[in-house]
A protein has these predicted regions:
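Extracellular structured ligand-interaction cores
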Residues: 59, 95, 129-131, 159-161, ...
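Non-catalytic accessory segments adjacent to catalytic cores
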Residues: 111-158
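Short, solvent-exposed loop/turn segments at secondary-structure junctions
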Residues: 77-81, 95, 137-142, 169, ...
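Conserved donor-binding loop and adjoining core beta-sheet/short helix segment
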Residues: 12-17, 46-118
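Short, basic/aromatic recognition patches
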Residues: 31-54
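Hydrophobic, Leu/Ile/Phe/Ala-enriched alpha-helical segments that form helix-helix packing faces
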Residues: 29-32, 48-49, 120-127
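A structural signal for short, well-ordered beta-strand segments and their strand-loop junctions
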Residues: 63, 72-75, 128-136, 163, ...
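Acyltransferase donor/substrate-recognition loop-hinge adjacent to the catalytic core
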Residues: 1-23, 28, 148-207
Length: 207
C-alpha cells in the first residue's frame, strides 16, 4: 500500500529505531509509571486494526527509544471512516497517549512527547485530517501530556469508558457492580442473550 509506505517514512524521520517488538512492549507495560489502559495492550491494538480492516486500517503503533533503549510505547493506527476520510486513533475514535518507563527523566519524556505531537501533525497533514480526538487516561487528574494538549485544543469535552475484566465469570463481574445498578443488570439478564466467547471473530461484532 503506497500510503502505508509514506506514513512509515514520516514515522522513521522522527523515530528511526522504532519497532513493535512484543517482549519490549510488554516490558514497558510492566514498568510504566502511568495508568496503562486496555488500549495499550498489543492484543487490543491488533483487535482494532483487524476490526477496521475493511476500512484500510494501518497499524502505526511504536516502541519509543532513547539512546537505543526502549523507554515508551505509543498505540496508534489509521483507518477510513464511513465518509472515506482518514482517522488517526488508538481505538477507532481517540488517540491514546503514550506511556513511559518509570524513572524516565521529565526532560527526556517531554522531548519525546513533543516529537510525537509533531509526528501526529505531519501524519494528519499527509492524510488530510483536520481534527483529532485525544483521551486522558489518568484517574482523577490530567496527565502532563493531556495538559499540553488542552493548551492547543480547539474544543474539550468529557466522555466516560466503562471497562470490564472479562477474565472473570459473569457472576464475579456482577458482584463488583454497585447495589443500585443491580436491578438494571438483572433486567439485562432477563431481556438479553448473554454469552461468553473464548474465540471472538470480527463477524460476531458485525451481526
Amino acid at each position: 500500500m503506497k500510503i502505508k509506505k509514506k506514513l512509515f517514512k514520516i514515522i522513521y524521520n522522527y523515530f528511526p529505531d522504532t519497532d513493535i517488538d512484543i517482549n519490549k512492549w510488554k516490558d514497558i507495560l510492566k514498568t510504566s509509571n502511568s495508568n496503562s489502559s486496555t488500549f495499550h495492550l498489543l492484543n487490543t491494538i491488533k483487535y482494532y486494526v483487524s476490526y477496521f480492516s475493511d476500512n484500510d486500517s494501518i497499524n502505526l503503533s511504536m516502541i519509543l527509544y532513547y539512546d537505543k533503549q526502549a523507554v515508551g510505547i505509543m498505540p496508534l493506527m489509521a483507518h477510513k471512516n464511513k465518509n472515506k476520510e482518514w482517522v488517526l486513533s488508538g481505538n477507532g475514535v481517540e488517540i491514546i497517549e503514550p506511556i513511559f518507563k518509570k524513572n524516565l527523566a521529565d526532560k527526556v519524556r517531554k522531548k519525546i512527547e513533543t516529537k510525537i505531537l509533531n509526528l501526529i501533525f505531519d501524519l494528519s497533514k499527509e492524510l488530510k485530517i483536520n481534527k483529532c480526538q485525544f483521551i486522558n487516561i489518568e484517574f482523577f487528574k490530567f496527565s502532563k501530556w493531556y495538559t499540553r494538549l488542552l493548551e492547543l485544543a480547539e474544543e474539550t469535552f468529557t466522555s466516560h469508558h466503562l471497562l470490564v475484566d472479562l477474565s472473570l465469570s459473569i457472576e464475579e463481574i456482577r458482584l463488583q457492580f454497585r447495589k443500585s445498578y443491580k436491578p438494571l443488570i438483572n433486567k439485562g439478564f432477563r431481556e438479553w442473550k448473554i454469552e461468553v466467547h473464548e474465540q471472538v471473530t470480527k463477524e460476531q461484532f458485525d451481526n
